[in-house]
């Protein structure tokens, strides 16, 4: 299965999900899907960055064939699509590390490059870079691209096969919103002619309304409006200070994107949580502080926009206090475990 979850299912497994658009229920090996409101759905781009993301450093990754339809395959395709934007003339800054990434299509094998910002100190392949850089680079690149530029490039990369699929979808939408029929032969009598003219005029406006509905539904089903980012273990191979810097930059980047963009992070790192709490606290006190410099400031966010949970004994529970900040007991316990060790 796509997320490799099939081995976690048994005869007693129950899965329920409901949104404004769809209801999904899985029980007793039976899957039931109901559309609640098919007219409000807006397509999203989902970008999943797995813990295996370091594979982007592999030479000739574009020649690697992933036969199984897994999240790793989707990640690889998204990476290959996004990296083309950052050529030698459009290098990508990697946080505040004085390093940049660029893609060199002229290279035969090592096409992904890391260069010092001064352009002189070194110019190496991503394959030869540290594991930390190999972990950070896909996060920074894909967040930067799919947060903004992707929406401008979307139609440019539509293949012929995809265009055929879209035409089939357009035909399906036409069947949902059919045009009304009307009598084209107007009667010779004034009263009937007038009546039929009114009917025809009404149909014209109705046709316009139907065309607008068709267009709106087609756009909502085919054109991505927002991106859902899912990052697995952003702390991977990073020193605590680098984890903090990455979290601050990630939140800053999300704030710059389209309204409705969504970020989901899974983590085992207390440093990621501490950094997130700094941004939540900054969001609460931003109107009360001035003339002070905080490294987290560009990542400050509203506590109302954030939910934080942990899985404990198989149950999902919130670890936020009433003010939206991380629970002090939770932070203290995490800190004590590290200090006591």
PLM features: residue spans?
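Switch/communication elements of ASCE P-loop NTPase nucleotide-binding domains
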Residues: 115-341
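P-loop NTPase switch/coupling surface
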Residues: 1-119, 217-222, 259-260, 274, ...
């Amino acid at each position: 299965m796509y997320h490799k979850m099939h081995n976690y299912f048994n005869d007693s497994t129950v899965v329920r999900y409901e949104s404004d658009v769809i209801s999904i229920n899985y029980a007793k090996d039976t899957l039931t899907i109901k559309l609640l409101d098919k007219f409000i759905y807006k397509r999203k781009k989902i970008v999943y960055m797995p813990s295996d993301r370091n594979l982007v450093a592999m030479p000739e990754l574009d020649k690697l064939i992933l036969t199984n339809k897994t999240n790793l395959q989707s990640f690889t395709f998204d990476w290959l699509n996004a990296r083309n934007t950052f050529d030698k003339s459009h290098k990508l800054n990697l946080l505040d590390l004085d390093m940049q990434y660029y893609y060199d299509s002229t290279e035969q094998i090592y096409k992904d490059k890391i260069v010092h910002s001064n352009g002189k100190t070194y110019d190496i392949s991503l394959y030869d870079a540290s594991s930390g850089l190999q972990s950070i680079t896909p996060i920074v690149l894909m967040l930067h691209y799919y947060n903004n530029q992707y929406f401008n490039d979307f139609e440019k990369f539509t293949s012929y096969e995809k265009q055929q699929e879209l035409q089939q979808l357009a035909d399906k939408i036409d069947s949902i919103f059919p045009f009304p029929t009307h009598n084209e032969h107007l009667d010779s009598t004034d009263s009937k002619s007038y009546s039929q003219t009114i009917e025809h005029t009404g149909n014209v406006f109705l046709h316009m309304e139907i065309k607008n509905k068709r267009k709106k539904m087609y756009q909502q089903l085919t054109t991505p409006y927002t991106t859902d980012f899912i990052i697995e273990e952003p702390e991977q191979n990073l020193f605590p200070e680098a984890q903090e810097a990455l979290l601050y930059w990630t939140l800053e980047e999300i704030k710059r994107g389209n309204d409705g963009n969504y970020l989901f992070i899974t983590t085992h790192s207390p440093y990621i949580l501490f950094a997130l709490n700094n941004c939540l606290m900054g969001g609460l006190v931003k109107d009360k502080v001035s003339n002070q410099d905080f490294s987290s400031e560009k990542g400050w966010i509203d506590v109302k926009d954030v939910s934080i949970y942990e899985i404990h004994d198989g149950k999902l529970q919130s670890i936020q206090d009433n003010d939206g900040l991380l629970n002090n007991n939770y932070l203290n316990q995490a800190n004590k475990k590290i200090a006591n060790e």
